[in-house]
Amino acid sequence: MYGLVVCLFGMIFGLIQYQGINKLPVHAAMKEISDLIYETCKTYLITQGKFIIILWALVAAIIVAYFGGLNHLAPDKVVFILACSLLGIAGSYTVAWFGMRINTFANSRTAFASLGGKPFPTYAIPLRAGMSIGMLLISIELFAMLCILLFIPVDYAGPCFIGFAIGESLGASVLRIAGGIFTKIADIGSDLMKIVFKIKEDDARNPGVIADCTGDNAGDSVGPTADGFETYGVTGVALISFILLAIKDPSIQVSLLVWIFAMRLVMIVASAVSYWVNDALAKMKYGNADEMNFEKPLITLVWLTSIVSIVLTYIASYMLIAQLGDGTMWWKLASIITCGTIAGALIPELVDRFTSTECAFVRNVVQCSKEGGAALNILSGLVAGNFSAYWMGLAIIVLMGAAFGFSTLGLDVMMLAPSVFAFGLVAFGFLSMGPVTIAVDSYGPVTDNAQSVYELSLIETLPNISNSIESEFGFKPDFENAKRYLEANDGAGNTFKATAKPVLIGTAVVGSTTMIFSIIMILTGGLADTGAIAKLSILWPPFLLGLLMGGAVIYWFTGASMNAVTTGAYYAVAFIKKNIKLDGVTKASTEDSKKVVEICTRFAQKGMINLFLTIFFSTLAFACLESYLFIGYLISIALFGLYQAIFMANAGGAWDNAKKVVETELHAKGTELHDASVVGDTVGDPFKDTSSVALNPIIKFTTLFGLLAIELAIKLPTTISVSLAVVFFLLSLVFVHRSFFSMRIAVDKD
């Protein structure tokens, strides 16, 4: 029950921050723009909600077949599992809506705060909004899981956890993928106008700008928030499944389950304490400063939270499991989680080395662009992405290796496959400062939108605006410094938007090993069947074929998601070029802006259908075809997906901040150098915000859904199973074909 109290504390913390941001001062012109962005986002999110329910019907059919037909659960219990899956969807959807709402409050308040002549409020408001999202997200997710654990009978809680996690994963997959497509169609459509018409960023006359602002929330707020909610849920379910399958002693099971949930409560406390301490330190240092490095206090917050979290992990472990095993298990398990916590702090630091405006790789992109234009800009960005994948992969390997080392110190007495449990705890440790990870990720869309709100409000052109602001709000606005603060803060936002992506994809990959182990336990009779275990090898051809197939699907997924962006952007650009009016108007018409939003929504929906249904039918096909082929497929998706996602996310981040350097430091807007940087940023848009980020929920959904699919498949007669595999595979090919040809741009005849 203490856990529920801590969850309520986290929710109250988030809601208090929400109310506080809503009450911050804001000029009417800026509030009008942020309200318009919110209304557009609301329409988009309602559309996606209807779409999620349609896809849920497909998943629900498999849940009914598995729990009702295969396991012969009573109808009322099957209905309750379905209700838990809907609860998972509702959780993802609710926190996504909350994140979108508070960010659309924060963007206009940040834009207005920049006029005060001091940079600190421009930093503090986006972070405050992010902490509100992070604390509420983790608290709601944990509250739901604690309710299942505490109030559902033990023999029935497992299926409810599975249903809840599948619902979370479905909601996150749709919102993350569709949001990623939407935002980059809008972003590219808006950005390319800077080259075509030589207009400034966020020019109010550009009909694509409102869609771009909507996309910042749909792709960089709604998607990541739902993704974060799902990540914490699925990682927890994977560990719960392992404990129930690999540990035979009920008393040890109970001790470890209590400990796991206590560690999740620790992350809430650690994040809240660290935020308050960091806020006080940042205020002392920068509160009255005229200049500040916006990245510095964010980096401090990440490391401070990791240190507090590690200390509390050891303290809580000693208090809860000091008597477990030989009396040393508490520090061994705490040390394994600490490996993940260090990874959660180290990965953002590594991301900073490849995407920050100050880093050597971004400076290399800028320098290459000066002589080689867009061609060398793109090549040097690819270099940054590839190098980042190496170093982040190495960091993850070293820390997983350390966790494996701890797992050899006697854990095998308590459980089967202790190394798998260790890897699951590493994934858990990745998330040990969850609210802060979400907060620094949410920082980016607010800073991006704040810049747009400032420009779209046309506040500098309003009659007698300086005197009006001084009269109403009590200060003289500083327009020049305001723009400079917003641009510099956006650079920090770009960097920290990039930091959460590898953390989340890392948890998907490391955590998926735990879920794959659950499938292996089913196939090998609890690791007792040596003949079955021998098939987990490249000496068993189906396993090798599965490894090859997983890589193929990852590369198709990358191409199909980018194609959805490319096609949508083509039509958005064509519409904007045809309808933009630059003479005699101060802003684009509402009708034209809505039309661009409509184009983005249409292609996001079409792309999402093809992507999700291909993954859905492929999972069923390979599970039905051959069990060990399916294991190879899952492993391959995780490994290929990890490096593809890291490479794409950081290459995109490097291109984005190279453009920021050209604009804010070199003041080269409107030059050939700027054009080259815009081209690079355009290529990077779907890299970092569509394909890479969508791989995280897809890996988790495939693994989690695969757990049901494989159990269904192995209990079917071989003839029926293979026949279904053929049918499902052909259906997947239909949507693979549609992912290009149904969205192909018509070729001009001339």
Swiss-Prot record:
Q: Does the keyword Transmembrane helix apply?
A: yes
**Which residues take part in binding substrate?**
K184, K688
Summarize where Ca(2+) binds, as residue positions. D656, D681, D685
User: What is the topology of this protein in the membrane according to its UniProt annotation?
Assistant: Multi-pass membrane protein
Q: Which principal EC class is assigned to this enzyme? A: translocase
* Location relative to the cell: Cell inner membrane
Q: Which GO terms describe its molecular function?
A: diphosphate hydrolysis-driven proton transmembrane transporter activity; inorganic diphosphate phosphatase activity; magnesium ion binding
Query: At what residues does the UniProt record annotate the site feature described as Important for ion transport?
Result: R176, D220, D227, D689, K700
So which domain of life are we looking at? Answer: Bacteria
Task: Give the residues the record marks as binding Mg(2+) 1.
Answer: D187, D191
What are the UniProt keywords, alphabetically?
Calcium, Cell inner membrane, Cell membrane, Hydrogen ion transport, Ion transport, Magnesium, Membrane, Metal-binding, Translocase, Transmembrane, Transmembrane helix, Transport
Q: Which GO terms describe its cellular component?
A: plasma membrane
- Cofactors per UniProt? Mg(2+)
Q: Name one Pfam family in it.
A: H_PPase
InterPro entries xref list: PPase-energised_H-pump (IPR004131)
Query: Per the UniProt record, which EC number(s) apply here?
Result: 7.1.3.1
Q: Which reaction does it catalyse?
A: diphosphate + H2O + H(+)(in) = 2 phosphate + 2 H(+)(out)
Biological role: Proton pump that utilizes the energy of pyrophosphate hydrolysis as the driving force for proton movement across the membrane. Generates a proton motive force.
Q: Enumerate the PANTHER family for this protein.
A: K(+)-INSENSITIVE PYROPHOSPHATE-ENERGIZED PROTON PUMP
The cross-references to NCBIfam families, in alphabetical order and at most eight, read: PRK00733.1-1
Protein's name in the database: K(+)-insensitive pyrophosphate-energized proton pump
- Look up and give the organism this protein is from: Chlorobaculum tepidum (strain ATCC 49652 / DSM 12025 / NBRC 103806 / TLS)
Q: Lineage of the native species?
A: Bacteria, Pseudomonadati, Chlorobiota, Chlorobiia, Chlorobiales
Q: Which gene encodes it?
A: hppA
